[in-house]
Amino acid sequence: MTRIGTPLSPTATRVLLCGCGELGKEVVIELQRLGVEVIAVDRYANAPAMQVAHRSHVVNMLDGVALRAVIEAEKPHYIVPEIEAIATATLVELENEGFNVVPTARATQLTMNREGIRRLAAEELDLPTSPYHFADTFEDYAKAVADVGYPCVVKPVMSSSGKGQSLLRSDADLQKSWDYAQEGGRAGKGRVIVEGFIDFEYEITLLTVRHVGGTTFLEPVGHRQEKGDYQESWQPQAMSPKALAESQRVAKAVTDALGGRGLFGVELFVKGDQVWFSEVSPRPHDTGLVTLISQDLSQFALHARAILGLPIPVVRQFGPSASAVILPEGQSQQTSFANLGAALSEPDTAIRLFGKPEINGTRRMGVCLARDESVELARAKATRASQAVKVEF
């Protein structure tokens, strides 16, 4: 039975969040609504989730010693990773010592890099994926490309938001794609995955919740990417019954193998009735921001309930919905957003401004949300709202 105490008292139920971006911010808000004491940790000050947590610490989360020191001092009941770039070996040690890592330390370790999760899906679970090879050197990479054939995709095994990812169509792309992957990798130069290109019709995120009552699948989320970054998402994505059933089968197999409780974002490629596994995040997904307007319980509310062992008897869908990012380019530590009245002038629209403390280049600073009679109308409405927002530096 779940018991939640009083924040900032000896009975408090404490959650320590590792990573404090816009997704973590929404998770903190949902935990706050349930009376949880939240400690936010990230590598820079005033990150979005820190602004709504009870307190925060600035720590390099790839530094296992520093991360352990904060966790041992705070003694949280739950450790909730919000990003991949964490000293996962330290999380494994802490879990073995009795700390509760969400969903599990193994899940955070396997999904920290593309190799662990790809080998689990393809080699252990025998799920359909694109053909792939891993490579550490340019020579091995060139051989992997020759084996996989053109067109193919190269990605660093460790990166986020599509950084370092590119499509190769001929030998002319070999060197520049290698260089781009090396620049985009989170740990600097290093290992890459070369994948055969799947001629898919569309890609989806199947948000999957493992909770005290079993597994719940949300309506499939369609999305559009540019340079590996999500630009817009919508729900529900139209699919054949066979493709939806296969997507749920694949998602359940992967999330069961990772274990624990929480929300997972399972990324899949779809063509007709065929489905291929791509990646999985053991946490809320950026494309799932659409659930802030599409459902009675957003992906963040569902994650909070699942973590705390609270039931999820039903999730109600409100109708066709979409999200469109606010993605300015500039340099500032005092960004302002204007023309919000125009952006919110249509019915069934909403805006989330993330409160990121600075921008240096292109950065996702907010998202516009919309609901309408069809996905097409919702997408158009969300895009109009996003384009109406004026970002001032």
Curated annotation (Swiss-Prot):
Chain sites annotated for binding Mg(2+): E267, E279
The keyword Repressor is annotated on this UniProt entry: no
Top-rank taxon: Bacteria
Involved pathway(s): Purine metabolism; IMP biosynthesis via de novo pathway; N(2)-formyl-N(1)-(5-phospho-D-ribosyl)glycinamide from N(1)-(5-phospho-D-ribosyl)glycinamide (formate route): step 1/1
Enzyme Commission number(s) of this protein: 6.3.1.21
Keyword ATP-binding part of the UniProt annotation: yes
Domain ATP-grasp: 119-308
Gene Ontology annotations for the cellular component aspect, listed alphabetically: cytosol
Residue numbers binding ATP: R114, K155, S160, S161, G162, K163, G164, Q165, E195, G196, F197, I198, E203
Record keywords: ATP-binding, Ligase, Magnesium, Metal-binding, Nucleotide-binding, Purine biosynthesis
Annotated GO MF terms: ATP binding; magnesium ion binding; phosphoribosylglycinamide formyltransferase 2 activity; phosphoribosylglycinamide formyltransferase activity
Database matches in Gene3D superfamilies: 3.40.50.20, ATP-grasp fold, A domain (3.30.1490.20), ATP-grasp fold, B domain (3.30.470.20)
Catalytic activity: N(1)-(5-phospho-beta-D-ribosyl)glycinamide + formate + ATP = N(2)-formyl-N(1)-(5-phospho-beta-D-ribosyl)glycinamide + ADP + phosphate + H(+)
Pfam family, one: ATP-grasp
GO biological processes: 'de novo' IMP biosynthetic process
Binding site for N(1)-(5-phospho-beta-D-ribosyl)glycinamide: E22, L23, E82, D286, K356, R363, R364
Coiled coil: none
InterPro entries recorded: ATP-grasp, ATP-grasp_carboxylate-amine, ATP_grasp_subdomain_1, PreATP-grasp_dom_sf, PurT, PurT/PurK_preATP-grasp, PurT_C
Subunit structure: Homodimer.
Role of this protein: Involved in the de novo purine biosynthesis. Catalyzes the transfer of formate to 5-phospho-ribosyl-glycinamide (GAR), producing 5-phospho-ribosyl-N-formylglycinamide (FGAR). Formate is provided by PurU via hydrolysis of 10-formyl-tetrahydrofolate.
Protein family: Belongs to the PurK/PurT family.
PANTHER family xrefs: FORMATE-DEPENDENT PHOSPHORIBOSYLGLYCINAMIDE FORMYLTRANSFERASE
Full protein name: Formate-dependent phosphoribosylglycinamide formyltransferase
